[in-house]
Amino acid sequence: MIPTDTAPPSKPAQGHKGYKNRRRLSRELALQGIYQWRLAGGNAQEIDLQLQQVNFYSKADGSYFSDLLQGVLEHSRDLEAQIQAYLDRQLAELSPVECSILLIGTYEMVHHPEIPCRAIINEAIELAKSYGGTDGHKYVNGVLDKLAAQLRAVELQSSPVRNKDPH
């Protein structure tokens, strides 16, 4: 598990309501589980059952959490290969937190096309800001942006460019 000094809050974050908040909590739980798996091993079912005991589990989207945890663990080799292509170092040299966040974001891009890639990247950045190193969110953003250009090229081409002056 993530050490208690970096564990997710026991209450949902304020400012987000309903569905989005439930998904964010699901990602936080998945981050804990994947972090634990990367450091100590174990199987998805055991980790899933253990994290169901976390006091804010009932506020999360349990099925989405299970999908993220089990999906990342099941497809970890493929996800790691996709991520490695965009890293400036070996995956093993990344912090376990940032590596886990990249695995979640990559899994969502590949297996959840219904979620806009910008939302996936933004959620990963928020996780990295909360649980990663000082500039970890910048690194996560850079890697996922490059992955999105490959995995979601059509989506990115069809979305309007923000902050562009039409004149």
UniProtKB/Swiss-Prot annotation:
GO terms for molecular function: RNA binding. GO terms for biological process: DNA-templated transcription termination; transcription antitermination. InterPro entries: NusB-like_sf (IPR035926), NusB_fam (IPR011605), NusB_RsmB_TIM44 (IPR006027). Keywords: RNA-binding, Transcription, Transcription antitermination, Transcription regulation. GO terms for cellular component: cytosol. Gene3D superfamilies: NusB-like (1.10.940.10). Residues 1-21 are annotated as: Disordered. The keyword Nucleus does not apply. Involved in transcription antitermination. Required for transcription of ribosomal RNA (rRNA) genes. Binds specifically to the boxA antiterminator sequence of the ribosomal RNA (rrn) operons. HAMAP family: NusB. Belongs to the NusB family. PANTHER family: ANTITERMINATION NUSB DOMAIN-CONTAINING PROTEIN, N UTILIZATION SUBSTANCE PROTEIN B-RELATED. This is Transcription antitermination protein NusB. The gene is nusB.
